Amino acid sequence: MREREPSLVYAFRQSTPYVNVHRGATFVLMMGGEAICHPNFANIVSDIALLQTLGIRLVLVFGSRPQNDEALARAGIEAQYHRRIRVTDDESFAIIKQVCGGLQYDITAQLSMGLANTPMQEARISVVSGNFVTAQPLGVDDGIDFCHSGRVRRIDVEGITRQLDQKGLVLISPIGCSVTGESFNLSSEEVARRVAVDLKADKLICFSSTQGVMDRHGEAISELFPEQAEELLVELEQAGEEMSGTARYLRAAIASCRGGVPRSHLVSYQDDGAMLQELFSRDGLGTQIVRESAEQARAATIEDIGGILDLIRPLEEDGILVRRSREQLEMEIDKFTIIERDGLIIGCAALYCFMEEAMAEMACVAIHPEYRNSNRGDQLVAKVAERAKRLGIRRLFVLTTRSIHWFRERGFDPLEVEDLPVERQRLYNWQRRSKVLSKTIS
């Protein structure tokens, strides 16, 4: 007898909004040589095929740093670097071109698989490579001749777009051609960044050895603004990790974000399904560098009523919150502040002012179950207190039956019912017998 798979059903339902949002979007994938030689690369290829099936336009930029170093070492050539850039002489470049060419064919072969009973069955991905990147030499710096090391001069946006319009997957190597007929060794991070910015891509996705950028506790930081990411980059450089994959990809992500790419992501190439979880779940798995946060606290509007009801209904049924009808919410929606994350309301609170006494009640405080162990409650209290202060309120109070200690930990002190505004005293429910706590905010 076949068994139901509720986890599969749940995953499909949760990912549906993101499938709709991402369809037709352009993603640039940046994959270093470390990712390509990792055992999980076959799974990443399957995930790339899935993205293509879902109608996402893909450009894959690959690097070859470890493969280059290994091939040069076998040839007895010591790798030379200056200011984090490889110095590519004639002998080195001949080997690097062979390595990159081999990798390009290997990646194309992997993306072309169509074996039965595999995720690639019937994938039929059309992989397109070409002279999409025009390069120029780096020249001489500090007396060091970079020889065949170059930088990106121009991206053929029209050519790449034409291939994407025809549902091709564009594969770009770190070797670029110049207008003089020469070729140059490029930084794959620079290539990916320029492609993402010039294409006006929706996302740049970087595959790192770690699950994004880690904090001091070894946990992945879910979201960073460019300024915050820059501070972490300085810390990495001071720790001597300026050449690490995380540092290189972080530089590219920051520059892409500042160049107009809305979101750049750092995910692990070692963890199976990391990219899919990052793209198709609300909280992701890695780190995203964003121009604007996916989460915001704001005043509620009439369109938010359905989401607020979904959030507070379970708490009303448990007796934690007083029941509110849709009609009541519609009339009082201007009193609500919400926290929204990717279209989902994960927190709400209402502010009822009693101007004569310069007091206000914070009511209907609710946080989504998946976010109760975070600081969303503190954010909500701070936002409501800030709003009350702007209105001239000096004292904020709450009525609660279950969350007394939570509010006490945040500076709220016990208050007698008799100390409430007269109008609020008349509405006090003596059967419910809620505890009253207050906090000075002036």
Curated annotation (Swiss-Prot):
InterPro entries attached to this UniProt entry: AceGlu_kinase-like_sf, Acyl_CoA_acyltransferase, Asp/Glu/Uridylate_kinase, GNAT_dom, NAGS_kin, NH2A_AcTrfase
Record keyword Transferase present: yes
EC number: 2.3.1.1
Catalysed conversion reaction: L-glutamate + acetyl-CoA = N-acetyl-L-glutamate + CoA + H(+)
GO cellular component: cytoplasm
Stored SUPFAM superfamilies: Acyl-CoA N-acyltransferases (Nat), Carbamate kinase-like
TM spans (from-to): none
Single Gene Ontology MF annotation: L-glutamate N-acetyltransferase activity
GO biological process, one term: L-arginine biosynthetic process
Protein's pathway: Amino-acid biosynthesis; L-arginine biosynthesis; N(2)-acetyl-L-ornithine from L-glutamate: step 1/4
Main localization category: cytoplasm
Keyword annotations of the record: Acyltransferase, Amino-acid biosynthesis, Arginine biosynthesis, Cytoplasm, Transferase
Subcellular location: Cytoplasm
Domain N-acetyltransferase: 295-442
Stated family: Belongs to the acetyltransferase family. ArgA subfamily.
NCBIfam families according to UniProt: N-Ac-Glu-synth (TIGR01890), PRK05279.1 (NF003641)
Comment field (misc): In bacteria which possess the bifunctional enzyme ornithine acetyltransferase/N-acetylglutamate synthase (ArgJ), ArgA fulfills an anaplerotic role.
PANTHER family associated with the record: AMINO-ACID ACETYLTRANSFERASE (PTHR30602), AMINO-ACID ACETYLTRANSFERASE NAGS1, CHLOROPLASTIC-RELATED (PTHR30602:SF12)
Protein's UniProt name: Amino-acid acetyltransferase
Species this chain originates from: Aeromonas salmonicida (strain A449)
